[in-house]
Every structure is written in structure tokens, then in C-alpha cells.
């Protein structure tokens, strides 16, 4: 009787360990997916900024006029 209970207990723990491994794999897939979504959103925001001229730090074309120092400033619409 003790042997049967011990065998059933070992088999039961093996099944639980397998389901735990499967849930860890699913969690890793989900976190990897969320990471790739966040990474993609970052790229999208960067490319929208490039298209709108946010990356043009040294040529004074960021929504403003040229200054006396060759436009070496970041401009926004309030500094005109």
C-alpha cells in the first residue's frame, strides 16, 4: 500500500512539474511578444520623429528660425 501511494505521488509530482514547465514556456513566449511589440512601437515613434524633423539638431530646421550662431539650438514653436 505504501509503495502504491509513493508511486502515485511521484507520478503526480512529475505531471505537475511538466505542466509548470509548459506554463513557464508560455509565459516566456508572452513576454517575448510584449517585448517585440514595445520595440516596434519605439521604432515607429522614432521614424515619425524623423519624418517630422525632430532629429535635425544642428541645422536649425526644427520648427524655428535661424539664430546668429548658425542655428546650433533646438527650436520649438514657442521660440520664434
Swiss-Prot record:
Listed GO CC annotations: extracellular region
Tissue expression remark: Pharyngeal tissues and hemocytes.
Residue positions where Leucine amide is found in the record: 52
Claim: Membrane is one of the keywords in the record: no
Keyword Signal: yes
Stretch forming the signal peptide: 1-17
Propeptide: 18-29, 53-80
Entry keywords, A to Z: Amidation, Antibiotic, Antimicrobial, Cytolysis, Hemolysis, Secreted, Signal
Main localisation: secreted
Subcellular location(s) per record: Secreted
UniProt record, GO biological process: defense response to bacterium; killing of cells of another organism
Its job: Exhibits broad-spectrum antimicrobial activity against both Gram-positive and Gram-negative bacteria. Has potent hemolytic activity.
Protein name (record): Clavaspirin
